């Protein structure tokens, strides 16, 4: 691991080892300088090495080297894309894309939403989200999703979540584990307002992102 640092003046304007940090901080203080530590990490910011075309990144420190951002992707301040993760574009990313996760074109991750990767409890399951999906604010998924899927705000779907499948008339069809629905398209995950039971309905209305969010004029 290494430390990215910047001191006032010409001292410590370099990358130092973690083991050097305590002494470097002490030396800076004795000289009346401020040593600012930006990160202690194995992965630097992606934009220090690669700047993709046609993207907007509100906070460059949230995109680690090894991430992929496709043309038309916007990553807002609280969005995060880990290494070996990808937003194929165009996408609006206000949530977290974990290591190994790929989201398809036109998919929107709402504020503080997340995807469960192999580094965050997902085991060996590779999570992907298809095209024109919406993961609402504070929601998330631990199963792969096909195209045109929606998870309502605040609902986190894990592989073992009990889900009641209902038809277009609202009639209950069967109860399954969420893993049994992995990879399917046109699913709408919501909670029953009275019981809190997780329901899966057919989602025939594709989510369209606001074109203005992806304008680079």
What are these regions (language model features)?
Residues 72-112, 131-132:
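Basic (Lys/Arg-enriched) interaction patch that binds polyanionic ligands
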Residues 98, 103-105, 109-217:
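Glycine-rich hexapeptide-repeat left-handed beta-helix
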């Amino acid at each position: 691991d290494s430390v990215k640092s910047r001191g006032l003046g010409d001292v410590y304007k370099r990358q130092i080892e973690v083991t050097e940090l305590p002494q470097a901080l002490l030396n800076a203080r004795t000289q009346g300088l401020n040593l600012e530590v930006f990160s202690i990490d194995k992965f630097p910011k992606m934009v220090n090495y690669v700047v993709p075309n046609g993207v907007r990144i509100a906070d460059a420190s949230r995109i680690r080297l090894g991430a992929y951002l496709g043309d038309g992707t916007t990553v807002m301040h609280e969005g995060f894309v880990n290494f070996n993760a990808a937003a194929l574009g165009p996408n609006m990313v206000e949530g977290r894309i974990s290591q190994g996760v790929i989201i398809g074109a036109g998919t929107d991750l709402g504020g503080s939403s997340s995807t469960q990767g192999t580094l965050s409890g997902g085991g060996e399951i590779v999570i992907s989200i298809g095209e024109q999906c919406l993961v609402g604010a504070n929601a998330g998924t631990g199963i792969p999703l096909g195209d045109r899927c929606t998870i309502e705000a605040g609902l986190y779907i894990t592989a073992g979540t009990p889900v009641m499948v209902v038809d277009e008339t609202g009639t209950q069809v069967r109860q399954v584990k969420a893993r049994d629905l992995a990879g399917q398209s046109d699913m709408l995950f919501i909670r029953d307002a009275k019981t809190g039971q997780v329901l899966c309905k057919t989602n025939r209305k594709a989510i369209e992102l606001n074109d203005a969010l992806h304008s680079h004029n």
